[in-house]
């Protein structure tokens, strides 16, 4: 069931996308379309939508490219990315990466949940790519402080093979239980 704010955002995007393609005067105008879902202040309108403000530039570009190529699927992002040229994707990635990270003010995980998550992360080597502070690097996403629902859904999609644009993550998360995913999402969201 689509939540009301998400449904409204989808309607706004559907109405504005053709106008943006025809009349965009710059990347800030194009980015306004993104704000219908990802939020005008960097806080997404729905918990299942990721924070873009302050996300790593290379990662944003790769995701837009994957949506455009069909390597990553989403009924909203697929058509949006399909309308973008390579330079548009690079410009959008730079635009959002330059914004300050949005603090969603999510609570820290309880100590037992944090311990479970740290154990899972250590055994899987998560910090090898996402780094010690969960900030990622150029092409690896920042996941510390990302939305709880988005984190949980994304990890489950990788584990279940629904999201395939990163074969390493599919293989890594294949062994995660629901409890592991819930603990990791709670822990990461509160970072």
Briefly describe each language-model feature range.
Residues 23-43, 104, 108-132, 147:
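Sequence/structural segment immediately N-terminal to covalent heme-attachment motifs in c-type
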Residues 82-105, 149, 174-191:
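C-terminal capping alpha-helices of c-type cytochrome domains
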